[in-house]
């Protein structure tokens, strides 16, 4: 879309700021019995995979998108990457940890969980995690909630809006001995413009613009945000919702 060309640098900058916090990877490392090997499924361009490198002797990543894996290989040459759907992924080794960042809900979750019988070592840990819907504190909160309810909501994928039954599926898989849902606090400070840019970079706002709002909606949203909030920075809640399961 044209707005991505017009605001490309800003989109990339804000996505770079909304990174997974260290506590995610520290929590993963604290729960695994060993640090020999980790696998990141649905790894995209490797931005979540490389965070595992300081914690494990060997790190591997997989994604079904060949172009994403090409980018990951160029950016992180010290990591082994493979092109494959997570449901079909095979490796020559077993892993102490298998992780999945903001991608598990797009997969056949039951098939992936069954796959953990072969990918995980005995007592190995599977962790799927994702951002919650961001909440901007202050006057922008009401504004973005209105935009969501009146314009964006119908364009969100149902997998993002319905109850997340991952924990129940983990228990039903009979692969794991224990499992729990863990919420990790994650507050990020962004400028009001960066908050708007984050939403404009999401799939649901992009779909709204394609189908209803038009390309001019980006500038309109930025203008309204500037009128509503003149503070230099805004605290935004990007809490991480994670599921841990141990074999």
Where are these predicted regions, by residue range?
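Conserved class I S-adenosyl-L-methionine
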Residues: 1-33
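Conserved catalytic/acceptor-binding region of the Class I
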Residues: 117, 123-188
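A short, conserved alpha-helix within the catalytic core of class I
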Residues: 107-116
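Class I SAM-dependent methyltransferase SAM/SAH-binding core
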Residues: 39, 45-88
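Conserved acidic residues
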Residues: 36, 57, 96
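A short beta-strand submotif of the Rossmann-like class I SAM-dependent methyltransferase core
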Residues: 100-101, 109
């Amino acid at each position: 879309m044209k707005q991505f060309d017009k605001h490309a640098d800003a989109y990339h900058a804000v996505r770079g700021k909304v990174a997974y916090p260290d506590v995610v990877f520290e929590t993963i490392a604290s729960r695994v019995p060993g640090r020999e090997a980790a696998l990141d499924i649905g790894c995209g361009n490797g931005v979540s995979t490389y965070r595992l490198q300081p914690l494990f002797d060997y790190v591997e990543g997989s994604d079904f998108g060949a172009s994403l894996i090409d980018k990951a290989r160029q950016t992180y040459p010290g990591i082994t990457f493979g092109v494959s759907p997570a449901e079909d992924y095979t490796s020559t080794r077993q892993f102490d940890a298998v992780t999945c960042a903001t991608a598990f809900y797009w997969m056949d979750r039951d098939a992936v969980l069954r796959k953990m019988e072969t990918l995980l070592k005995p007592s190995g840990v599977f962790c799927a995690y994702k951002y919650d819907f961001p909440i901007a504190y202050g006057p922008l909160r009401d504004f973005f909630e209105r935009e969501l309810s009146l314009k964006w909501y119908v364009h969100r994928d149902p997998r993002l809006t319905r109850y997340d039954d991952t924990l129940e599926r983990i228990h039903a898989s009979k692969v794991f001995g224990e499992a729990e849902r863990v919420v990790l606090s994650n507050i990020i400070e962004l400028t009001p413009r960066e908050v708007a840019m984050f939403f404009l970079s999401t799939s649901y706002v992009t779909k709204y613009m394609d189908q209803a709002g038009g390309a001019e909606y980006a500038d309109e949203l930025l203008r309204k945000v500037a009128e509503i909030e003149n503070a230099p920075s805004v605290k935004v809640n990007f809490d991480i919702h994670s599921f841990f399961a141990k074999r």
